[in-house]
Amino acid sequence: MPSCDGNALVIFSGGQDSTTCLGWALNRFRTVATIGFHYGQRHDVEMQCRQDVLAAIGDVRPGWKAHLGTDTVVEMGLFRELGETALTHDVAIEMGRNGLPSTFVPGRNLMFLTAAAACAYRQGIRHLVLGVCETDFSGYPDCRDDAMKAMQVALNLGMESRFVVHTPLMWLTKAQTWDMARDEGGQDFVELVLERSHTCYKGVRDVRHPWGYGCGTCPACELRRAGWDAYVAGHAVHGEGR
């Protein structure tokens, strides 16, 4: 049974983090809608993966299908026009002079959250959920707790609303994110995240590792692999299976 009285909108990309957050929300809210974005990303694979996850997640736990609401996809191609990044253009993945990786898309999460709030406003939804994290992350400033708290204030002032921005992964390591998936949906949910979610910056979907699909060498794959290895090792110490 949901533990929160209300509906939620999850910013859902089809990646590990947002998939885990979707399961978290389905356990807590009466109806959980989703929103995704075409922002000019180089690879369409993540948009296909989000559809695969949405098609399968309702069968993970009894009741999840009944709580899953509508899905909205918004076009945000302006990010390709604003400048080159490794996620929107064919450029090398490397650290920039400002200390941020070339995969950083300036303003992306801020724009996503603003668009999600506008969508939620029209649907009478108060709770916004997204999978940003300040622990195991690439250093993106728009993933930090301070940025999310500031956005909640700005959105509530600008729309005269009482939105609550939920960031369930904010202080979790990637290993703890795998633990959350197991806690929220059991081993079936862990398997769904492994098989259907997408993380790889290079869009590789034809190479399967123990931790899922990907090139295995980009920063996103390395982080996902390290988290999975720590998760498996932690459960092995306690004599548990995956």
Swiss-Prot record:
GO terms for biological process: queuosine biosynthetic process. ATP binds at F12, S13, G14, G15, Q16, D17, S18, T19, T20, C21, L22. Pfam families: QueC (PF06508). GO terms for molecular function: ATP binding; ligase activity, forming carbon-nitrogen bonds; zinc ion binding. Keywords: ATP-binding, Ligase, Metal-binding, Nucleotide-binding, Queuosine biosynthesis, Zinc. SUPFAM superfamilies: Adenine nucleotide alpha hydrolases-like. Its EC number is 6.3.4.20. It comes from the Bacteria. Pathway: Purine metabolism; 7-cyano-7-deazaguanine biosynthesis. Binds 1 zinc ion per subunit. Zn(2+) binds at C200, C215, C218, C221. It catalyses: 7-carboxy-7-deazaguanine + NH4(+) + ATP = 7-cyano-7-deazaguanine + ADP + phosphate + H2O + H(+). Its cofactor is Zn(2+). InterPro entries: QueC (IPR018317), Rossmann-like_a/b/a_fold (IPR014729). Catalyzes the ATP-dependent conversion of 7-carboxy-7-deazaguanine (CDG) to 7-cyano-7-deazaguanine (preQ(0)). PANTHER family: 7-CYANO-7-DEAZAGUANINE SYNTHASE. Belongs to the QueC family. HAMAP family: QueC. This is 7-cyano-7-deazaguanine synthase. It comes from Nitratidesulfovibrio vulgaris (strain ATCC 29579 / DSM 644 / CCUG 34227 / NCIMB 8303 / VKM B-1760 / Hildenborough) (Desulfovibrio vulgaris). The gene is queC.
